[in-house]
């Protein structure tokens, strides 16, 4: 389900990885003791994906998925007695990614935008990011200028960027920076 069309969401600055949806639960660690049992995967309660293209060439894609809360079993010692209990190892989580690209200048040049969000129920932790990108093919597609810039939207801001300029025909060269 998540593999088909996944390349539309991929880029050098990888903001979204669909393999995290349904992965082995590991969000919470017990405050004491040792994990002795936990599920191998997180249950996906619902998921939807829409991929398409308009007649004007705008490509779009949206993925939204909700995963269940999962519990693990821990073993700990209390007053010299070995005990076991369950603890929340993974809360309900909502994963979202949306992206679109629009052709400009010619059919091989595009600008794009992407937004991601991960929200975990009962947690004051959100992971959101946005990204803008472009691919410009100029001079009969011999000169290529690409770039992207991303930032997080939460308490701990992070930024990333990448620029690349390349030329091909008759010889090839490129300059890139991250």
Region locations from a protein language model:
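Outer-membrane beta-barrel channel domains
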Residues: 1-178
């Amino acid at each position: 389900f998540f593999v088909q069309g996944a390349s539309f969401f991929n880029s050098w600055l990888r903001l979204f990885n669909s393999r995290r949806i349904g992965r082995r639960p590991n969000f919470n660690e017990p405050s004491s003791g040792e994990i002795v049992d936990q599920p191998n995967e997180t249950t996906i309660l619902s998921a939807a994906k829409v991929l398409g293209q308009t007649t004007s060439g705008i490509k779009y894609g949206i993925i939204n998925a909700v995963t269940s809360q999962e519990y693990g079993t821990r073993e700990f010692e209390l007053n010299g007695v070995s005990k076991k209990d369950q603890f929340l190892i993974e809360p309900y989580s909502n994963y979202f990614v949306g992206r679109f690209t629009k052709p400009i200048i010619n059919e091989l040049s595009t600008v794009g935008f992407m937004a991601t969000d991960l929200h975990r129920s009962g947690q004051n932790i959100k992971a959101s990011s946005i990204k803008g990108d472009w691919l410009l093919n100029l001079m009969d597609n011999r000169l290529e200028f690409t770039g992207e810039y991303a930032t997080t939207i939460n308490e701990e801001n992070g930024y990333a960027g990448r620029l690349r300029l390349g030329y091909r025909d008759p010889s090839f060269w490129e300059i890139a920076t991250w």
